Regions:
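Extended intrinsically disordered or low-complexity regions, especially N/C-terminal cytosolic tails and loops
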Residues: 1-207, 219-304
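Acidic/aromatic/glycine-rich contiguous surface patches that form carbohydrate-binding/processing clefts
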Residues: 215
């Protein structure tokens, strides 16, 4: 495999023009944008939509600005999705802490007791790891002022306080580790969700949250986990192929469906308006919508 050598900004631009057929009308602006974003993040990240599959070169008429516009669109998407994913994360944390403490208590001896979890079979090592994570946060020298305060003043940290330091991935595992009666109560806080359905939503949402938080490419991201089939698929008339829904399982539209299922009606409407504004700000090609996993009638989800 040929080694990738360092190229100056001028050399990068010349390579794109001469070797890849990209039109660049303003070289100085292109250099400024490469400095701002980096070649890998901008060009490698967003070139595929604009390339010819046969030659690997850009299609005729594609300009540097087209790539940067898609980059900006994706950047706005990340900010929007992260905002509302964090809303759900806070709500799930609040719900789990409430129902756990209501059932078992809020002391360390309560939430560090494996008997208060579904401690069987394959879940045992997951719960053991979770106990290490929870107990590891109970330190006088914690980075979090509220943890230090509770440890100093009360020598323990209530679960409803400790939940704030958990990542969404840890929260997802904590939910999956709960006994059925706790999971059912949490699901009831979000309507008529099934226990496993919410578990899959949290697993999928964790991956999308990480993509947003780390500024990775979002619009065509796919997760290994997939949402379970639910009534929302049928109500949106999402087509199937070989018995499997072709949109909304593990693509970005899956995250839209999660937001629809877990946000309040008012919050989802606010999110939906912002998403529409994002599309209006960045007119995109249908090929991008396809890569996002958005069906042609995706707007129906606001009324579903």
């Amino acid at each position: 495999m040929k080694k990738k050598c360092f190229l100056t900004y001028d050399e990068q631009i010349s390579f794109l023009v001469r070797e890849k057929g990209l039109h660049i009308s303003d070289r100085n602006q292109a250099k400024a944008l490469l400095l701002k974003t980096g070649y890998f993040s901008l060009i490698n990240g967003y070139k595929e939509v604009f390339k010819q599959s046969e030659t690997g070169k850009f299609r005729n008429g594609i300009d540097f600005e087209n790539i940067y516009e898609l980059y900006c669109f994706d950047d706005d998407l990340r900010s929007l999705f992260l905002k509302y994913i964090l809303m759900i994360e806070r709500t799930v944390k609040s719900s789990l802490a409430y129902h756990f403490c209501e059932t078992y208590g809020d002391l360390g001896v309560d939430y560090l007791n494996v008997n208060h979890y579904d401690y069987f079979g394959k879940k045992k090592p997951v719960i053991d790891k979770l106990m290490q994570v929870l107990s590891g946060q109970l330190r006088m020298d914690s980075d979090y002022a509220y943890i230090r305060h509770y440890m100093t003043a009360y020598h323990y940290v209530p679960l409803w306080v400790l939940m704030n330091v958990l990542t969404l991935g840890q929260l997802s595992k904590m939910y999956a580790s709960q006994k059925g009666r706790i999971q059912i109560k949490i699901c009831q806080d979000f309507g008529a969700l099934r226990v496993n359905e919410l578990g899959k939503m949290l697993a999928v949402m964790t991956k999308f949250r990480n993509v947003c938080a780390h500024s990775d490419r979002l619009f065509d991201f796919r997760t290994k986990d997939a949402l379970l089939d639910c009534n929302l698929f049928a109500s949106l008339s999402i087509p199937k192929e070989k018995g499997r829904y072709i949109y909304g399982k593990n693509d970005l539209f899956a995250q839209v469906m999660i937001l629809k299922s877990l946000l309040s009606e008012a919050d989802f409407h606010s999110y939906f308006q912002c998403l529409q504004e994002c599309f209006e700000k960045h007119p995109i090609h249908k090929a991008v919508l396809d890569k996002m996993g958005f069906p042609s009638h995706w707007e129906r989800i606001n009324e579903a």
